[in-house]
Regions:
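Terminal accessory carbohydrate-recognition/targeting modules of carbohydrate-active enzymes
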Residues: 1-163
C-alpha cells in the first residue's frame, strides 16, 4: 500500500510504494533499491518474499525481502534536519555481506559508495552501490530542498528516534 510521506509544515512530499521505492512529488527521479546478495540480485518489486508494514501511528515504513541467511530490511522516514530529508535505512539481518544499489546519486550517505560495483544488473545512470556488512546498517538521505550528495551527519535521527 503506497503512502505519502513528508515533514509536518514542510512543502516536500513523496510517496513510498508498496515495494519501498520513493517517488518525490516535485518531479525528481524515483529512488528505487536493489540488493546484491550471495546468490543473485534482488529487486524488491519482483520478490515473492516482499513484506511491508507501517509503524502504527508514525510515518515510518518497513519493507523486507528474504535473502540468503536472513532478511534485508529497508526503512523510510522523514526528518526536519538540514531543511528536511527523507532517510532510507538499510539493515542487513543476514549473516552474509551484501551490496545495496540505489537509483540516485544525489543522496547523503553514511559510507562512501563502492568504486567497483558488482556486475549482473542494469542500473540507471547515476545509481550508486553501497556495501552493507552482515548484521549492520547503512543510511542514505534525500534532501527535500535541493539535491545534495555527501556525508550524512552522524546525528541524523534513526527510525527508533522518530517513532
Amino acid at each position: 500500500m503506497s503512502r505519502v510521506i513528508g515533514n509536518r509544515g514542510g512543502t516536500w512530499r513523496g510517496v513510498v510504494t508498496d515495494h519501498g521505492s520513493i517517488i518525490p512529488s516535485d518531479g525528481s527521479a524515483e529512488l528505487s533499491w536493489h540488493v546484491a546478495a550471495d546468490d543473485r540480485w534482488y529487486t524488491p518489486q519482483n520478490e515473492p518474499s516482499l513484506r511491508q508494514k507501517w509503524y502504527a501511528g508514525f510515518p515510518v515504513s518497513e519493507t523486507r525481502i528474504r535473502i540468503p541467511n536472513g532478511d534485508m530490511v529497508q526503512r523510510v522516514y522523514c526528518v526536519a534536519d538540514l531543511g528536511g530529508m527523507t532517510v532510507i535505512e538499510f539493515e542487513n539481518e543476514s549473516t552474509l555481506p551484501v551490496a545495496i544499489a540505489v537509483t540516485r546519486s544525489d543522496v547523503f550517505t553514511t559510507r562512501a559508495p563502492a568504486e567497483n560495483p558488482p556486475q549482473g544488473i542494469d542500473l540507471p545512470a547515476g545509481s550508486i552501490v553501497l556495501p552493507v556488512g552482515h548484521k549492520s546498517t547503512v543510511r542514505i538521505a534525500l534532501a527535500h530542498s535541493s539535491p545534495h550528495a555527501g556525508r550524512l551527519p552522524e546525528d541524523t535521527p534513526t527510525h527508533q528516534q522518530v517513532v
